[in-house]
Each structure stands twice: as C-alpha cells, then as structure tokens.
Amino acid sequence: MYNRVEAPILFTVLHNMKYGLCCISLNLQDGDNPAKFQTMTYKRFSGLPRSEALSILGDRILNNMVVTDQIIQYCADNNMVYRISSDLFPLITYDEANIELEDLPNYDDIQDSFDTLAQTIATNDVRISCHPSEFNVLASLNTKAVDKTITELNFYSSFMDRIGCPANYESPMNIHIHNKHGSNKEIVQRFINNFNRLDCNCQSRLVIENDDKLNCWSVRQLLTDFYPATKIPLTFDYLHHACHPDGMTEQTALEECYMTWGNYKPLFHYSESRPGNNPRAHADYANNTFNTYGLDFDLDFELKMKDKAILNFSQQEFAHAR
C-alpha cells in the first residue's frame, strides 16, 4: 500500500487516506532535545507570587506552542493529519486561577507563536483537529459543568481560528455525549440547548463520537435519536463500536457515520484492545488491519505508542502489499 522511503519515518500513502497523530510525537521526544509539552498545576501556581507564577506559566505555554509547531511540521513531512493536544494552555480556562492569555508577561511572544503555527499549517496544508477531554459534557444536568464545557470548547475553537483552521468539519472538534440521565430525547434536547450557547465557529466544527460503554451512546443510538435532531456529523470509532456494537455490523455503522459528513472528508478513529480484562483499554501497537469498505476518510490512530505505532503499521502494510 505504501512506497518505501529511505528515511526513518517517512512514507507515501498510495490512496487518499491520511493517518492521524494524536497530540504527542514519541519520535520527537527521542534525542538530546526532546519536544515535550509542559503543564502547571493550580497548587503550584497558587503557591507562588502571582507575577512569578504568570511568568512560569507563560514560558510553559510558549514551549507548548513551539512543540506543537514542531509536531505539525513533522506531520507534514510524514503525510499525517494532526490532533492538537487539549493540554496546551494549562489553567487558562480554570475558573479559580482567573487567568487570561493577556495577563502573561510573554503574551506578545505567544501571539507570534500563533502566527508561526498558522504559517506552518497553511504552507504544508496539514489537517488539524481537536478532541477536548471527556469532562466536556454539553448534555450534563450540572450547570457548572456545562458552563465549564462551553468555556473550554469556545476557547479551543478560538485557538483554531487564530491559527488559521477553517471553521467547518475540515477541522473538527470531537466530543462525546457522555450522558444517560433521562430519556434519549431529553438528553438530546439538553445537548441542543447548550450547543446553541457555543460560538458560531465552535458549532461549525463540533462532531460527536460513538461511545464504548454499553450504557452510553452507540452508533445505532446516535443515528436514531441524535443525528436526526442535530445534523451534527458522527465520528466512527472502530474500537468503541467493537465494544458496543448494539446490533450493527461494523460496515453498516461505518457507512452510516460516513454519510453524516456530507461533502466533508470524515475523520474517524482507530485503535485495538490491549490484551487483558478490559477490552476498552487501548493497545500499544496495531496487530490487525482495518476495513474502509471502499470509503475515503482520514483516520486518527489512538494507539499508545503514537507515531511509532503509525510507522509500525505502515511498514507492516507495505510488507504485506509487496
């Protein structure tokens, strides 16, 4: 399926699908100058004089922008799409910290880094996506949790705006419904009510993924109760469907999710179960292959070994294709 390239990680895709790197590059963490993200806890931040805390936090956020730029360039070099990390801006959306980006002493440098990211993305035409954490639940009964979700989703959508990502499903923001309190109709209505509070560009990017737990939202439930009421595209996750098929074959579930994306190229998710008692746990590497059923979409690899797993899978596919 791939042409061999005499470089440690480069490969050329012989079809339109691109594989997706999720957040972290393990290959770029190797060597003397590892590209690693940095964080800061609120306990650490609040234990310092505010000016010192803001300076440290600003330096860490700037580091995260530099690392993100390195990873996006790496993805461009290796024909991959990229899911930006949801931990790039520690504490910025945390209420108790009460921080705006403008408060950081290196704010101008951070703005310059946004410009650099935008140029890297535009020059290399790398597809960018985002998958905010599982704690973002628009259908929650907890109003504080919903407010935090709206703040978080709007913030990351505005960041995607700032770095030049289109406000549509070419740059999707993927979340789960993650709620089963009430009937499906009630849950969908709560979701819609809170979805309507999001910024327009955030609404234009949001897509919903099928769940892996038996008491949550399968592809069948999403197609039956959610999609008809919202027309929001559905992200098909191979492993989640294997854990919670709800009577649908993989082919039917994938094809039906594919159709919800309309004229946009879907971005789906692939992983496999780690050996053990929990089938939902993600494996380090892929030991199997997947079936596209003749459809064209991009595919985020949600395997623990990140880009090392993508390279390993690509090499196996090339060997099988020879």
Place the predicted regions along the sequence by residue.
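Short, structured patches in soluble enzyme cores that scaffold and shape functional sites
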Residues: 132, 173-179, 208-212, 236-238
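A short, flexible beta-alpha/helix-coil linker loop
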Residues: 89-91, 134-137, 179-181, 241
